[in-house]
């Protein structure tokens, strides 16, 4: 089982002081779930209240971790401190407490534009006592030979602007590789405002993953989107379909890059009925032309949603309710709160303005 328990940031964009998003049941009635963490967390607030920056902070932490292996010695790091106080010259801090393969860890680091200032990794016992696996500060990197042997003798091989965890993973450290994998495979971050990027992923799941496709289609029927089915059509690239008035250089570039490639079109299936309500035939229509913006968004993010549910992942969605009817947003949330559907302990964290989702 994998899960997110707490995310902490300090001195990032609009967050000057240390703030934490807590998803554990530490102060809640644990009887409300069979698992010790929240399946759903909604972040409410007015515009410019920092909701999106919290999601952006996790995205930034994830980016630094996954790209640290590519950072050259002396190369600047991503760094956006709070600019309206003397903290503008201090490091930004990121920390994540999480469950990975049923074990709990606390990993974090702080950085400015030039270097990793601090970095730490702890294993957390069931009684909440902590075992330091390694600690990095201005004096160097201290590694536990007993509890983190894969990091021994690698301390001096780490550049100032590179994460120690990343180096150990690159050199084959098993736990370090698992933690890097947790950030790359178990955490997904979506924008609810720009969902076009997820269309291909959702279409591929409909086309190739029959079990997932059945779940997605059943969900579409349950929320009564108006179509009876959704299908895909694969086509070879046809240069003749390019507009006649397209600039010749652009046309040549597209032909060069796309010849031999296939495109996937999404079609919605609608029933045609007679005056007595009897089905006469089914007709297919281009999905992006016939359906509403809310329906298109729901389909576009349905792939990541069901991938998260089936794999027990963690999904962050900024502006979940944008362009979508409140009832559709509520049904998406219910997928995660219903333990008969969310059998793998997947988590949904989202920002919203819709207080109706509180119910």
Language model segments and positions:
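A short catalytic or substrate-binding loop motif that flags glycine-/basic-rich loops and adjacent residues
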Residues: 1, 87-90, 258-262
